[in-house]
Amino acid sequence: MSLLRIRKASLYGFSTVFILLQSYAVAYPLRAFRQNDGIGIAMNPSQDGGFVSAEKDSDFEYWMKLIISAVLILLGGVFAGLTIGLMGCDDLHLQVLEQSGDASERVHARKVLKLLRRGKHWVLVTLLLGNVIVNETLPIVFDSIIGGGWPAVLISTAMIVIFGEVIPQATCVRYGLSIGAKLEPIVLFMMYLLWPIAYPTALILDACLGESQSTMYKKSGLKTLVTLHRDLGIDKLNQDEVTIITAVLDLREKHAESIMTPIEDVFTLPMDRILDEDLIGEIICAGYSRIPVHKPGFPHDFIGMLLTKTLIGYDPDDKWPVGKFALATLPQTWPNTSCLDLLNYCQEGKSHMILISNSPGEPHGAIGVITLEDIIEELIGEEIIDETDVYIDVHKGLPRVGENNDFWNRMLHRSHLSTMAALHKSQRSHDLAANEHAPILNPKNSALNPRLVTNDRVKVKSPSLIQSSTGYGSMSQSPSRSDLPSKISRVNAELQAHGSQRSSIDVSKENKSSVADGPSSQAHNGPSTQPPEALPNGTDPSSSKTTENNGNQQSERTESADGKKDNSGSISSNSSKTFTGKRVRLGNVIESNVVSPDGTNRIVIEPFERSVDPNNADIVEMVERNGIVVPKVTVTSHEDDVDSVHNTPMSVSSTLSVKTSSSKVPRNKRKRRKGKSKK
């Protein structure tokens, strides 16, 4: 539709210019020409001996000059319109249209990009030179048609301004991409036609001004652009999309200290606290899935966290201390660590709660905790409320109100709403002030201890009833207890059969490869007779073989995780599945293991710029190899590297072993190639 309008406008413009020039030229120039010369109609001799009227020659010349004037006006309009149309096209916008536009926009953007990449200044100088040449030639042609005087000046100026500047530029501002793509051959022809002048001038402009840069937005500009798309444009964004996009752009600049829960508001436990009925009730009523645990008498010296799901099978009558349970690792980090880096760390599955401390790795300095839910709330820009949340915002002390109470959901910010009063029964109407209203539903945790709070849906048996009944509560009385040894032996038999089957497959593979390589390479397939110093990291052959088998098992687990069949042709069991698609931002944070003098291990997460001693074995930069995130190490055969391997933490040393086995395979291949060449 736009191209049809452009063609119609061009046709109307050409017709209008031609008619105006003709009407004025008919009225003035021939009459003025004849009066000024004072000559009548002259007769020119012809070839056949006759005479031809000079009026016919003047009419032909007049019409030719009239057509040339109209063409020059249109060419001037084309050059002026393309100048503002092509120079107004941004490279970044063209790349966006080339990749995400519709079919016509992709074709037009590709043509214009190809033209502008030859040199934007070259295109600019060519169009300006063409416009100048046309505008300087047009008065010369007008003078011979219209003659001098103010009528000629007025008409030529009006023609150039209206049909050579205003209309073309106004059209190309709106349809510059499509017009530039259609006229790309003409511009390319003019570029090479005016190359002796245009190209050197463009080189001078490039040297003085530099190459033109695309329009790049800062994060603040992007947020403003996204906000404008909420109210403008064809594909408008709703408020939720705008909130999430702007929150994602701010996530990297947000520090952990700004969104953490202060340590004073965190539900913590000392490691010597006895887990009895009362403490179990407190944990259930609190509604937290992870509870930080600190040393007795040192509320800021945290050693781990207690996962409440480990208490499912715990009997409160045992009265174990908290420190007797298997505590999960509670990593520590600095207050200014980026929330985006912490999100990537939590994605590795190591911990969903991180301790914020002014001195990570030390038994003091804890100022708060941050969870994966806190980071995701900042990521989406809204609070997440699950079934067991008591507070909407711990920082502001806003309690949770029932989802059907829309009025109190809007009134939670009022100062007269007491946090603790909302946890109890509603006040009576005569106890309320004039500006207060009783909530319809109370913020109440549904997961209460049935031994303390009566619940019709939960039946609690007394201890005497439990002892009198058979097959309940006690492992010795449970019928599944007798089947436990048989289950263990059956599982061990399956594992042993699976291992022997895998080893037989490996042996058959080696035999096939040895037969294919010939006798010269069979010597390298047998047991390794190299000294320990010849192997990577100075490990002995037996350990190297073990790590190689572990590497093969790991590769087989990866295949089974992808849903592929192993070498035996059967699908591997679910127990062999492993997750290898870990997604991290490499080099942003470093995980180090700090051991205090009392033997407590603490995991410290710090930004990459804070590593003052990169040669320390406890601080390893994580890199990605074959889709698995492993520490960045250099495998050498020096003896002093052996000590560094043994001093490395367990996770790092195991990764080093796998790396050693993987680096051993190419060496054997090189030996086989040498054997073939000798043969």
Swiss-Prot record:
- Domain of life, source organism: Eukaryota
According to the entry, every stretch annotated as the CBS domain falls at: 260-321, 322-387
Give me the stretches of Low complexity compositional bias.
651-665
Renumbered to this chain, the Basic and acidic residues biased-composition regions fall at 556-567
In this entry, the parts of the chain located on the Cytoplasmic side of the membrane are 87-121, 165-184
Q: Which CDD domains match?
A: CBS_pair_CorC_HlyC_assoc
Keywords in UniProt for this one? Answer: CBS domain, Membrane, Phosphoprotein, Repeat, Signal, Transmembrane, Transmembrane helix
Q: Where is the composition biased (Basic residues)?
A: 666-679
So which stretches are on the Extracellular side? 28-65, 143, 206-679
The Gene Ontology biological process terms listed for this entry are:
magnesium ion homeostasis; magnesium ion transmembrane transport
Major subcellular location class? membrane
**Nucleotide-binding as UniProt keyword:** no
Positions of modified residues (Phosphoserine): S476, S478, S596
Locate the compositionally biased regions of type Polar residues.
Answer: 464-483, 519-528, 539-555
Its record classes its membrane topology as: Multi-pass membrane protein
One cellular component term (GO) for this entry is: membrane
| Residues covered by the CNNM transmembrane domain | 58-241
GO terms (molecular function) for this protein are: magnesium ion transmembrane transporter activity; transmembrane transporter activity
A Pfam family matched in the record: CNNM
- For this UniProt entry, which segments traverse the membrane? 66-86, 122-142, 144-164, 185-205
- Region spans: Disordered: 458-579, 638-679
Which segment of the chain is annotated as a signal peptide?
1-27
* Name this polypeptide is given: Uncharacterized protein C4B3.03c
